[in-house]
Amino acid sequence: TLGSSTVICSDKTGTLTQNKMTVEKVFCNDTTSDIERAETNEDFRKLIYDCMLCNDSRVLENGEIAGDPTETALVDFALKLDYPVSIMRENPRVAEVPFDSNRKLMSTVNGKDGKYIVYTKGGLDEILRKCDSYLYKGSVRHNLSDYAEWIRTNNEHMANEALRVLAFAYKEIDHVPSKYEMENLESGLTFIGMVGMIDPPREEAKKAVEKCKHAGIKTVMITGDHKAT
């Protein structure tokens, strides 16, 4: 019974937190910054496109964004920086590899004017395993193993600020992939950057945890996020 409990395990998102994501920080152009101070060059534009297109949420006629809280936060982030919702219409999805909790990745293929781009988002470690290059201030560089430590350091900094971090990558292809080619879609990617999102705690969560502590009950939080988050 509850009265004889010694340990209580709780999931985090939506139970201890409000499940209302907001993008707070961005790692792009070799640095982490608040979104208001981010350097908005071509690298940043690619990150925004990845946020908007590798995304299953929808912008409704009344301006509201419907979908998963993480994905709606990514679209809201782009719209607040004046990137138009028309980007989602003008770059239609022609193929996809849906998000899978085991892979911790999602990929889409979007086309425009006969050109196709694979956009991928997911956990940092999973993204880095699929990449062989990275964007660095407008150029694609291939010494990813040397640069990966700097990426992980910035990921750790954001996680230590209680931010949930998603990483983004892309590659250009010259045709719509066949069913066979879809198996290797998430390979040879170029790392773009990361975003850090805050999911505010519920006001009552802190008091509930304190009551458990005073009662001698150990509390355990269950989450798929980075340990530091």
Residue positions per predicted region:
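Conserved cytosolic headpiece of P-type ATPases
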Residues: 1-229
